[in-house]
């Protein structure tokens, strides 16, 4: 009986790993900014003076940022452990990133150039990484651990 050891993370898998690590860093920084803003007494006074819908939107945005950070952290750990579920969850994570980029493009009061650039980077990464994760024999040979 022969057992094959899983391949190491390398080759073209370093690109998706780098994208994941940069996303983890950016979501961590976003959470730090949210926390810094929410820890200020002036923020509570300002939010208290806003409409209830604005307060709810702030809360939903903060909870979404926490959920995305947690999911990105979990996926990064699973990526390094070469778990079998990584390709499926990486694709789900990319689709969530596309949805958030489309939301930012459509609804945020951000300059169009910044929103378009964020949307294009996310769409390009998704268009390149999803077929690679679905069809690559290297991906199938790397992510084999339960």
Curated annotation (Swiss-Prot):
The keyword Membrane applies. Its main location: membrane. It comes from the Bacteria. Residues 34-59, 111-112 are periplasmic. InterPro entries: DUF2569. Residues 1-12, 81-89, 134-146 are cytoplasmic. The chain crosses the membrane at residues 13-33, 60-80, 90-110, 113-133. The keyword Phosphoprotein does not apply. GO terms for cellular component: plasma membrane. Keywords: Cell inner membrane, Cell membrane, Membrane, Transmembrane, Transmembrane helix. It is a multi-pass membrane protein. To Synechocystis PCC 6803 sll0481. This is Inner membrane protein YdgK. It comes from Escherichia coli (strain K12). The gene is ydgK.
